[in-house]
Protein backbone atom coordinates (compact mmCIF):
# COMPACT_ATOMS: atom_id res chain seq x y z
CA UNK A 1 0.00 0.00 0.00
CA UNK A 2 2.83 2.37 -0.81
CA UNK A 3 1.92 6.00 -1.38
CA UNK A 4 -1.64 5.59 -0.12
CA UNK A 5 -3.03 8.12 2.33
CA UNK A 6 -4.65 5.63 4.71
CA UNK A 7 -6.51 8.30 6.71
CA UNK A 8 -8.01 9.77 3.55
CA UNK A 9 -9.02 6.32 2.28
CA UNK A 10 -10.60 5.54 5.66
CA UNK A 11 -12.55 8.81 5.52
CA UNK A 12 -13.89 7.86 2.07
CA UNK A 13 -15.08 4.54 3.45
CA UNK A 14 -16.69 6.11 6.52
CA UNK A 15 -18.48 8.80 4.47
CA UNK A 16 -19.73 6.17 2.04
CA UNK A 17 -20.92 3.89 4.84
CA UNK A 18 -22.75 6.72 6.62
CA UNK A 19 -24.54 7.81 3.45
CA UNK A 20 -25.40 4.25 2.36
CA UNK A 21 -26.94 3.58 5.78
CA UNK A 22 -28.85 6.87 5.71
CA UNK A 23 -30.30 6.19 2.27
CA UNK A 24 -31.29 2.60 3.09
CA UNK A 25 -32.54 3.06 6.65
CA UNK A 26 -36.16 2.34 5.70
CA UNK A 27 -35.30 -0.92 3.91
CA UNK A 28 -34.87 -4.32 5.49
CA UNK A 29 -31.71 -5.84 4.02
CA UNK A 30 -28.13 -6.82 4.76
CA UNK A 31 -25.35 -4.60 3.38
CA UNK A 32 -21.67 -5.36 3.53
CA UNK A 33 -18.36 -4.28 2.09
CA UNK A 34 -16.31 -7.00 0.42
CA UNK A 35 -13.23 -7.34 -1.73
CA UNK A 36 -9.94 -5.51 -1.33
CA UNK A 37 -11.47 -2.64 0.66
CA UNK A 38 -12.84 -5.07 3.26
CA UNK A 39 -9.65 -7.10 3.48
CA UNK A 40 -7.38 -4.06 3.70
CA UNK A 41 -5.43 -5.17 0.61
CA UNK A 42 -6.60 -2.30 -1.58
CA UNK A 43 -4.65 -0.12 -3.96
CA UNK A 44 -5.13 3.54 -4.71
CA UNK A 45 -7.30 2.59 -7.72
CA UNK A 46 -9.45 -0.01 -5.90
CA UNK A 47 -13.20 0.44 -6.01
CA UNK A 48 -15.73 -0.13 -3.23
CA UNK A 49 -17.62 -3.42 -3.59
CA UNK A 50 -20.95 -3.49 -1.75
CA UNK A 51 -22.97 -6.65 -1.37
CA UNK A 52 -26.67 -6.59 -0.61
CA UNK A 53 -28.71 -9.60 0.46
CA UNK A 54 -31.98 -10.53 2.12
CA UNK A 55 -33.77 -8.13 -0.22
CA UNK A 56 -36.43 -8.40 -2.93
CA UNK A 57 -35.40 -7.75 -6.52
CA UNK A 58 -37.61 -4.64 -6.54
CA UNK A 59 -35.96 -3.23 -3.43
CA UNK A 60 -32.50 -4.11 -4.75
CA UNK A 61 -33.09 -1.99 -7.85
CA UNK A 62 -34.49 0.73 -5.61
CA UNK A 63 -31.24 0.67 -3.61
CA UNK A 64 -29.17 0.75 -6.82
CA UNK A 65 -31.09 3.86 -7.89
CA UNK A 66 -30.68 5.46 -4.46
CA UNK A 67 -26.93 4.89 -4.58
CA UNK A 68 -26.36 5.69 -8.26
CA UNK A 69 -23.66 8.36 -8.48
CA UNK A 70 -23.02 8.40 -4.73
CA UNK A 71 -19.25 8.53 -5.25
CA UNK A 72 -19.60 11.78 -7.21
CA UNK A 73 -21.97 13.30 -4.66
CA UNK A 74 -19.56 12.49 -1.83
CA UNK A 75 -16.50 13.46 -3.88
CA UNK A 76 -14.99 9.99 -3.50
CA UNK A 77 -12.51 9.24 -6.30
CA UNK A 78 -13.40 5.53 -6.47
CA UNK A 79 -16.30 3.75 -8.13
CA UNK A 80 -18.90 1.88 -6.10
CA UNK A 81 -20.07 -1.51 -7.37
CA UNK A 82 -23.28 -2.94 -5.94
CA UNK A 83 -23.95 -6.69 -6.16
CA UNK A 84 -27.16 -8.53 -5.30
CA UNK A 85 -25.88 -11.56 -3.39
CA UNK A 86 -29.31 -13.19 -3.46
CA UNK A 87 -28.90 -13.74 -7.20
CA UNK A 88 -25.10 -14.15 -7.35
CA UNK A 89 -23.46 -17.45 -8.25
CA UNK A 90 -22.87 -19.74 -5.26
CA UNK A 91 -19.14 -20.05 -5.99
CA UNK A 92 -18.75 -16.26 -6.05
CA UNK A 93 -20.59 -15.92 -2.73
CA UNK A 94 -18.41 -18.67 -1.26
CA UNK A 95 -15.17 -17.00 -2.39
CA UNK A 96 -16.26 -13.63 -0.99
CA UNK A 97 -17.18 -15.27 2.31
CA UNK A 98 -13.74 -16.88 2.52
CA UNK A 99 -12.02 -13.53 1.93
CA UNK A 100 -14.11 -11.81 4.57
CA UNK A 101 -16.63 -9.04 4.62
CA UNK A 102 -17.27 -5.96 6.72
CA UNK A 103 -20.96 -5.90 7.66
CA UNK A 104 -22.50 -2.44 7.51
CA UNK A 105 -26.16 -3.32 8.08
CA UNK A 106 -27.74 -6.52 9.43
CA UNK A 107 -31.40 -5.82 8.57
Model regions and ranges:
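Catalytic core of pol beta-like nucleotidyltransferases
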Residues: 1-30, 38-44, 53-107
Amino acid sequence: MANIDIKREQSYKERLKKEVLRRTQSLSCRIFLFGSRASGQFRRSSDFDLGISKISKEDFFRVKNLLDGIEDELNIPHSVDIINFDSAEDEFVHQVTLQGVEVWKQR
